[in-house]
Regions:
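Charge-rich, low-complexity N-terminal segments
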Residues: 1-47, 52-112
Length: 112
């Protein structure tokens, strides 16, 4: 599969998952979750879904557990929205790039 097509599939999956998590997922353990990126394998059998979660470490852990528990529902949403041969098995991973950027900014400001 071409990299351009992979990029389009990843972006489409990110949009579908973002909408499903924020508007359709009713689990109270899911806090303020943002899907930051999706990386699918070339054969579209696996997808890593990177999410950032606003809150303390306990809230993050509960949100990640709830997302992993709801992976079947979210996978069906992807299958229903996208026309792709295989629906990827979803794996949710915590994305700490926002935290790291804030920490670096704080360190730079302290150094001035």
């Amino acid at each position: 599969m071409t990299s351009d097509r992979m990029r389009r599939v990843n972006e489409a999956m990110r949009e579908v998952l973002s909408g499903a998590i924020t508007q359709e997922l009713k689990d109270p353990r899911v806090g303020f979750v943002t899907v930051t990126a999706v990386e699918t394998s070339p054969d579209l059998r696996h997808a890593r879904v990177y999410v950032s979660v606003l809150g303390n470490p306990g809230e993050r852990k509960r949100s990640m557990q709830a997302l992993n528990k709801a992976h079947g529902f979210l996978q069906r949403r992807v299958a229903g929205e996208l026309r792709i041969k295989n629906t990827p098995q979803l794996e949710f991973l915590y994305d700490d790039t926002v935290e790291n950027a804030m920490r670096i900014t704080q360190l730079l400001e302290e150094g001035e």
